[in-house]
A protein has these predicted regions:
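Conserved G/P- and acidic residue-centered "switch" motifs that form tight phosphate/ATP-binding loops
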Residues: 113
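N-terminal beta1-alpha1 cap of cysteine-dependent amidohydrolase-like domains
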Residues: 1-110, 120-123, 128
């Protein structure tokens, strides 16, 4: 049986203050592979390297994971404040239009923590900083 390909959106991290990486938590990869019986595909949150139409055609579904960085308040009509914390603008540029395209197409996805906030913002909602 061919396992469905499930895209997992990566988070941007800096290692040793200089080395930028795209990463996904092992627990998310294990959940896709073992629980959902899918083939995990780690999707870098790098807008210049990722084409949303290609992703949608290749993946049966997506997982939008949690992460330290928050959705930038500009995405829901607010100005950033210190309460918002750090941001990952590249991830915003991938996830928000991807979610909108998935909803339009009726393709399945799951949002966890930040991922659920991305779904909310992509659908026109706002967030409260804490």
């Amino acid at each position: 049986m061919v396992r469905p390909i499930i895209g997992i959106i990566s988070n941007h991290h800096i290692i040793s203050e200089t080395y930028a990486v795209q990463a996904v938590g092992s627990i998310n990869v294990s959940a896709v592979a073992e629980v959902a019986q899918g083939l995990p595909l780690l999707v870098p949150a790098l807008p210049d390297m990722v084409r949303i139409p290609d992703l949608i055609d290749q993946c049966a579904g997506f997982v939008f994971t949690g992460g330290r960085a928050n959705v930038h308040p500009q995405e829901y009509g607010e100005k950033p404040t210190p309460a918002h914390g750090e941001f990952d603008r590249d991830r915003d540029r991938i996830t928000l239009p991807l979610i909108q395209a998935l909803v339009e197409r009726g393709q399945p996805f799951l949002g966890i923590c930040r991922g659920f906030q991305e779904v909310n913002v992509a659908m026109g909602g706002t967030l409260y900083p804490e």
